[in-house]
Amino acid sequence: MPSDLASYLADHYLTADPKPSKKRKRKHGDSKKIKEGAGLLIQDDDDDAAWTKPSSRDADADELSAAATIAGTSAEFRRATKSSWKTLGGGGSSKTNTDHEAAAADAILASAAAESAAARDAEDDAPVVEGASVAAVKMSDGTHAGLQTAATVAAQLQRRRAEEKAQYERERAERRAARGGGGDSSGEEETVFRDATGRRIDVTLQREQKRKAEAEKQRAAKEALKGEVQIEEARRRREKLEDAALMPLARGKDDEEMNNAMKSEQRWNDPMMQFMSENDKREAGGTAKTGGRRVKGRPVYKGPAAPNRYGIRPGYRWDGVDRGIGFEAERFKALNRRERTKDLEYNWQMDE
């Protein structure tokens, strides 16, 4: 019985101590205790004491504090002022009241969240997400309007270039498919050029003509650097190559062309050369003096050599060193000096 009485009193008459007020200095234990879920007030004997009664200053502070308090007072105070009925039932009413308060709080939170979402939708203050379905304002170069970072602008420009390239490839493929060219690059459209009269200009033909003219100019410049002998030899080689196309594959001893070519070739050690006359040599295709060779066909020195009074050329094995005493050179100097003096004397006589 005592345990049941203690639990009954705790459930129906005892409440937790409220938090102390910062503006009123009271004792930690209030004289009045409000039972949760009931309207009965328990008053101590010392409540009538003067030191426990609040002063006018404390009352004003309480009014200001109540005015500054956010809407909604404690459940204990509302129940204490609205109802003074005493509940005689068990402790199930406390749990029911707590459930009702939790449901009311959840309803308030849900309504506040709904109002906040509606306000965001109405004021359009939702954050902008890159790549979202909301279309952002873009400029002509493909970048978004407004303040952007360098990396964002570079990525937007790269994306714009990729889109333009893909669009160009699609249009190019469509044009090829329309012309029936497939993937052949030769089906590309060419730029048409026209003159002042409207006549079409064949750019390919003009380029070919310019290329040929340039090649002809270069060939003429190379030909100008060659001598007559080189030009003649080149002509003979071309003729020989042209004749080789009609030449039979097998050539024997009766081939006149080959026999004439072998007879016309001159050799310095040919013993028959000294018995041939000038006419025979010319008929054979040679000359009296060809390539620094004498009529007899013996080799001679082809380099420069000092003149002598007999007109004898040095041997073909001479190394170019003059090993004489210099008489021939002094002789020619004396002859030249005498001729020059003679000319000067004649000119002086004419002046007088």
UniProtKB/Swiss-Prot annotation:
The annotated regions of Basic and acidic residues compositional bias extend over 160-177
What are the Basic residues biased-composition ranges? 21-30
Q: Which UniProt keywords apply?
A: Coiled coil, Cytoplasm, mRNA processing, mRNA splicing, Nucleus, Spliceosome
Q: Which GO terms describe its molecular function?
A: RNA binding
Q: Which domain of life is it from?
A: Eukaryota
Map out region (Disordered) in residue numbers: 12-100, 157-199, 206-225, 281-314
Which InterPro entries has this protein been placed in? Bud13, CWC26_splicing_factor
Does rRNA-binding count among this protein's keywords?
no
Q: Please, one GO biological process term?
A: mRNA splicing, via spliceosome
Compartments, as annotated in UniProt = Cytoplasm; Nucleus
Q: Name one GO cellular component term.
A: RES complex
Give the residues annotated as coiled coil. 23-51
The family annotation for this protein states: Belongs to the CWC26 family.
Q: How does it assemble?
A: Associated with the spliceosome.
What function does this protein fulfil? Involved in pre-mRNA splicing.
The protein depicted here goes by the name Pre-mRNA-splicing factor CWC26
- From what organism does this protein derive? Pyricularia oryzae (strain 70-15 / ATCC MYA-4617 / FGSC 8958) (Rice blast fungus)
Q: Which gene encodes it?
A: CWC26
